[in-house]
A protein has these predicted regions:
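Short amphipathic alpha-helical leader/targeting segments
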Residues: 33-34, 155, 248
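Acidic/polar, glycine-enriched structural segments that form the non-catalytic walls/loops
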Residues: 1-133, 217
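Catalytic cores of carbohydrate-active enzymes
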Residues: 95-105, 116-117, 123, 140, ...
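Aromatic-rich carbohydrate-recognition surfaces in CAZymes
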Residues: 47, 54-75, 131-245
Length: 249
């Protein structure tokens, strides 16, 4: 009572002969208008000064909802086929069914929690978390799917973390915030100096895992200095006579 409730419905009228079957397809689509920041005139509280843009990656290709829907409709069969293509090798394997489902379902990280902006910077939101995004410890369990299938996206987030390495050599806990903005290479993250002990070790482990999966030594060497600084930070947290860093996690 006293509240305005909004809703919508889609209905289609048709006829069916006895025993006849028809398939009716609906497309649900929404469009994010591109939020453009006037960095010379907009108040500073409107955006994160040192961060990336507030657009979406599809803004590079589509300029209206109509264009986006037309593309989705015209390419629907190809998109369906190519989605099934990467799943086929899993479904046809000898893995147990529960594990097949788990592997395919790991893709949820991309379509429920990922931000990919117009520039191509990527980060993942761990959950509610008050808007905090790009959690390094969350990556340990969430990254294998997109590291394997979308290595460039995985590296985007890893590179922002590396660029945001703090003065002690520690990798930060977060690199973005839904209500402020996200970091970018060469910029600043809105969550500086926030870290837990496993963030730095987790970043190093994932960098090594990338090399193990891709064999890309050039990419690994690019961050050799960051790895060294991270290891020095972890050593600084090892009590005398103990080879394990001690701290909050």
């Amino acid at each position: 009572p006293g509240k305005t409730l909004g809703g919508s419905a889609v209905a289609l009228k048709g006829r069916l002969q006895p025993g006849e079957k028809k398939t009716v397809r609906f497309m649900l689509a929404w469009y994010y208008p591109e939020l453009e920041i006037d960095r010379e005139n907009d108040p500073l509280e409107f955006y994160w000064v040192g961060g990336s843009d507030y657009g979406r990656y599809f803004h590079n290709f589509f300029h209206s909802l109509r264009q986006l829907v037309r593309y989705g409709f015209a390419e629907r069969q190809r998109l369906r086929n190519q989605t099934f293509e990467w799943q086929r090798s899993i479904l046809e394997s000898t893995l147990p069914d529960w594990y097949k489902f788990k592997l395919i379902n790991s893709g949820y990280v991309i379509y429920t929690n990922m931000i990919l902006n117009k520039k191509g910077d990527m980060t993942v939101n761990e959950g509610g978390m008050g808007g905090l995004a790009g959690t390094m410890d969350q990556r340990l369990s969430a990254h294998p799917f997109y590291q394997k299938f979308f290595t460039r996206l995985d590296r985007s987030e890893m590179m922002i973390f590396a660029d945001a390495q703090q003065t002690r050599g520690n990798i930060p806990h977060f690199i973005g915030h839904y209500y402020f903005g996200m970091g970018t290479v060469g910029g600043r993250v809105p969550t500086e100096e926030g870290w837990m002990i496993d963030n730095t070790g987790g970043w190093i482990i994932q960098l090594a895992k990338d090399y193990e999966q891709t064999g890309d030594l050039k990419y690994l060497k690019r961050y050799a200095g960051r790895v060294y600084n991270g290891m020095e930070f972890l050593r600084s947290l090892m009590p005398e006579g103990v080879n394990i860093p001690v701290g909050g996690t």
